[in-house]
Swiss-Prot record:
EC numbers on record: 2.7.7.6
Regions annotated as coiled coil: none
Catalysis performed (reactions): RNA(n) + a ribonucleoside 5'-triphosphate = RNA(n+1) + diphosphate
The keyword Transferase is annotated on this UniProt entry: yes
One Pfam family recorded for the sequence: RNA_pol_Rpb2_3
Designated gene of the protein: rpoB
GO CC annotations, alphabetized: DNA-directed RNA polymerase complex
Record-level GO BP terms: DNA-templated transcription
Superkingdom per UniProt: Bacteria
UniProtKB keywords: DNA-directed RNA polymerase, Nucleotidyltransferase, Transcription, Transferase
Protein name: DNA-directed RNA polymerase subunit beta
Enzyme class at the top of the EC tree: transferase
Subunit structure, as described in the record: The RNAP catalytic core consists of 2 alpha, 1 beta, 1 beta' and 1 omega subunit. When a sigma factor is associated with the core the holoenzyme is formed, which can initiate transcription.
InterPro entries hit by this protein: DNA-dir_RNA_pol_bsu_ext_1_sf, DNA-dir_RNA_pol_bsu_external_1, DNA-dir_RNA_pol_su2, DNA-dir_RNAP_su2_dom, DNA-dir_RNAP_su2_hyb_sf, RNA_pol_bsu_bac, RNA_pol_bsu_CS, RNA_pol_bsu_protrusion
Amino acid sequence: MSDFLITESTLEKTPVTASNIRVRKSFAKNKQVIDIPNLIELQKSSYEAFIQKDMDPDRRGDAGLNGVFKSVFPITDFNNTASLEFVSYTLEPAKYDVDECRQRGMTFAAPIKVTLRLIVFDVDEETEARSIRDVKEQEVYLGEIPLMTANGSFIINGTERVVVSQLHRSPGVFFDHDGGKNNASGKLIYSARVIPYRGSWLDAEFDQKDLIHVRIDRRRKFPVTILLKALGYNSEQLLEYFYDLDEVYVKGGKLFRKLDIERMSGQRALTDIVDPKTGEALVKAGRRITRAIVKKIKDLDITELDVLPEDLEGKVLAKPLIDESTGEIIADANAELNAAIIKRSIEAGIESFFMIFFDGLTVGPYLRNTLLVDKVSNKEESLVEIYKRLRPGEPPTLEAATTFFGRLFFDPETYDLSEVGRIKINHRFGISMDECPPSHRTLTHKDILSTIKTLIDLKNGRGVIDDIDHLGNRRVRSVGELLENQYRIGLVRMERAIRERMSLQDVETMMPHDLVNAKPVNAVVKEFFGSSQLSQFMDQTNPLSEITHKRRLSALGPGGLTRDRAGFEVRDVHPTHYGRICPIETPEGPNIGLIASLATYARINNYGFIETPYRKVEAGQVSKDINYLSALEEAGHHIAPAARDEAGNKAIQTATTITRRDGEYEIVDKDKVALMDVSPSQLVSIAASLIPFLEHDDANRALMGSNMQRQAVPLLRSRAPLVGTGVERLVARDSGTSIVAQNDGIVEEVDASRIVIRRFAKGGELGANVDIYNLTKYQRTNQNTCFNQKPIVTVGDKISKGDIIADGPSTELGELALGQNILVAFTPWQGYNFEDSILISERLLKDDVYTSIHIEEFECVARDTKLGKEEITRDIANVGEEALKDLDSSGIIRIGAEVRPGFILVGKVTPKGETQLSPEEKLLRAIFGEKAGDVRDTSLRAPSGVYGTVIDAQVYSREGADRDERLSLIIEEKKRKLEKDLAVEQNVIKNNAISKLRDILVGKITTGVLLNEDGSQKLLNKGQEITEADLETVPFELLNYIPLEQDLEFQVNKIIDNARNQLDAVKLVFNEKIDRLRKGDELPPGVIKMVKVYVAIKRKMQVGDKFAGRHGNKGVVSKVLPAEDMPYLADGTPVDMVLNPLGVPSRMNIGQILEVHLGWAAHNLGKQLGAHLEKWNAENARTEMKDIFSDSDISAKLDKADDASLKSMVQRMKHGIHVGTPVFDGARESDVKGLLAKAQVPSSGKSVLFDGRTGEPFTNPVTVGIMYMLKLHHLVEEKIHARSIGPYSLVSQQPLGGKAQFGGQRLGEMEVWAIEAYGAAYSLQEFLTVKSDDVAGRTRMYESIVKGENILEPGLPESFNVLVKELQSLALNVELMESDILRDQDEDFGDEEVIEVEPVAPVASKDEPEQH
């Protein structure tokens, strides 16, 4: 067996014939080396590391939430007289469980309590020594922190959300150049940037004149030497650090220069270099010194050369020249030598000159020139200068400047490189971990000097710049880290408030809780979950979309990129993405490449870098060791692809092999190979690895295919694909939509809403060995699809841990099942497949193949208004009994009622404003009581387009409010369900205890008599041998009163006590839930009662729905054709879908054709197997199945299977055997042909098709087969709506747009041209006036329609008035005047309106044109 098609471990425990297991024939050639890790581990482990919920406070360390508290505390007041210290924190259990939070619109969160210690000191005024006066410790409530559900999501205000991991630039140092863009000559401008995790950025860059400048936090730049001098270095030290020195010394009145042999190669000789023995010139002055000459000089042991004084002119001094007799400085460091200085120095008896070496070729004078520009001379001036630049307007004092500079880069409170940043800097500059450990998280002087030195080296042509898209320079911030940062922001805000409180009030009388206000922390966390760009509404269309959402990596978000600024390089696929980020799955459109998905086997290490697994290879031998490596760690290694090896060899079989190394492909000897991929599919993400034959699809289409699988709607009857890849099982397991058995056991009880499994005892372990799994029934998801679980086990089934026992939405037998296996034909049909349209058989509609259930939630809230309370009631004025027929006495619609648009779901009345009543009305009201006139009907009605059935209604009311009948019923129902759960749990606990007692007691002798509770009856006699029947007569309560020998009695008591403890615990949980039901609900302020009504809508497939395959082949249904008119096969089977063959060649997604062929073979093999059912012969069936599966493991299992289970297995396979063809390791063309031959169909995969209308065969054979087609969430019913009249925009008075606003269709410029082209003038006038924004005309039109007249009287469109107003706002006084002059001239003109424009602007001069 191979590649995650039922793993062997599953098979060992569970027979292949089990009803809840699907066996796939695998085409994989590679044995699976390593299991795919849990798919949502990324989210769960990150959050666990942050919250450390169940960890002992002492062992929490400096990570996560504990680290945040430790970094902010202790907080001292301004005078150092008090200190508030952090001791530990505890998380209490969440108040509501996940389901309750979903229903009530609450946040699933745990209250957090922090133990703080307040220490008050006495300060001696003279010595300023502190002594502790008082210590107070107290637990302080710090609000709530949202908890992650078992599936890796959060529930915030009742909706499920996911925090997406962010891909951002790793902290550290980066070197780059501008690519020559900023200079006409293409000269490269180099720059360096030190990015901390938090704190000020430091940029160093060259300018056009080759001087080095720095910026702090992208402010104004200043020469780098000012920064270096502020660190305490002077010019002399800087020149010595950045340059090699040349020494020239005076000896016997002559000048000699020391030779630096290592540096001479490639230089020009200043003077002739002569062989001292022969006097022969080795190289003439001005000539270049080659390597050969350098070797000669070495051999001849020449160490010095004589120089003339004029040779020194123009050289730059590294150290000052000082006349020792007078102490006078002849020339300072960095001064240029000239004849006068040289002469004077020699006269003053200076013995040696130190000069800096630069030749303008391999070493440039950049730092020396920068020193000349910089005007400051010492550390103090530098500090003040930097302070002035960064804090303009503040008085620069030395003290302030020193503190400010220290806090910029060297104070752990304000500057944090993080461990990652420190490791990256050490790695870049070759600093050892001993010299600077990861715990040193601020900059050092050496870091800054190394940065400048490396920058200068780059400019001099040594070293390479960094690639910022390399995954060694990008890291992932997961949930835990994002939340940690938010919590830190909140705590820092809180810290300020605490400091102020400490100084304002008397600390001695205060307790820690008086100082702490948790609001800022809670506000920050709430804002992060509610409105951060990375906290997203979970995509819950189907299990795959959930999993993909949790595994998503986004480069957007706070501290990341923005869509507009991101270039092509960032979005592109990088060689380091291999096995870490999927190159295929990314959205189309503006986010392409910015949002990616984690590859199948990838994981994220402690530093946030993505790692991928490799097998170790030594001397061509592949070992079992698996190494997870990050992009930096794999650099320089030769990595071989996973060999396609059927024999399972442990060594590479060829002498040379193709390998990857640093993004390049090389063919090398097998001995050089260091690593090997673990699986061919480690390259792609989960969604892409669900596409069979992905290797035959063009990347663009594969991208669409993996994206469209996420939009597939869960169908009424899910069917797993005949042609899968084997990953289907994993998605179903890890998404949390299916139910996975937690322990081995036997199924005790199954119904639609719960499964009870009795656990096997492990090593005689005591305890209530029972697992109760409650199934979710018809729950609404975020995308309004239906979440429903159904059991796939029966009573008595043996279950192994990890087995799937209930299917969720879009899963079948524990495998992901997004669509249906459909018989398709590729042929044109009457133009109905034009532009990717799909022709569909009516059979799919009749059999509900593509019917899905969608659940809409409607909410009605009764508030307490200023005019009085709103009321939810059945008693609504002016509404007929017909409209109220489905409402119960409380005014809420009954469950099971059919709903259409406009139906009342919840009756509600709202008080109207009090009107002045006439005396007569007052009298009538006094006589006849309240009139219904003071309330208006504000009932919740079903919106347009909703045709469905009410499946649930939930009522929530405040504590103390009167309970209506419906609420009481709901509470009773919930109570009954809880009691039933309790009874089941208690029964199983008792039965379990009894079964253990049975093992101990049967056959043992009693030592006394046992009476029943009231003593009226003997249950057991003295000296009686206990039988199973005897035990059944003893009530559970009396079991530990059976008189026995002492050690037996001890064992019995232990079992009974254990059972009682468990019964008590279960009862306690039950009581808590019952209390909560009785209490009433937490509702937002001002809300008295809230009703939620859930309506299930059945959406059948229809024309206009969007369908897609898994290869990016999408289309829209163009016609539903009666089955009898569809093309049919020779045996009379009509096809289900007709697709356009022209959709394949240009799109280059050939995978779909291979899928169709393989599906056709699998389908026909299933039919062949099914034929055995008519004349059942177990041996024949077994032989044929062994032949089909051709896998030794499965064959062995089939041999063991009995006839009945074999028959049920064949029964399940009669519509097709399921095959698995893993990505990049699946069926080859020969395999497909072989299977077609086994299935006895033509190996071309083509069949003769007949026209269903005429019965004539088509001219050519047609490709027919099984394709897996998905119905996507873009349903035409949810998109189309109709409007005659409706809401209008306030300003322009034109109809609104969009379905949500019940808007109209826009008639744009081009549509106007089209109508003009037809000459339909009156229709056009009607469109542009009375149908749109001619307010008066609209009313007149309505009147004339009511009167039955046919008159169109258009007036002035409102948009014209808007235009006039806009012109007036430009100070052009445009007025509309009706002129009588025209009317006098000609009566027939009708009501003409004349516009006169008079400028309000100043009178135009002669030169200017007049303004109108």
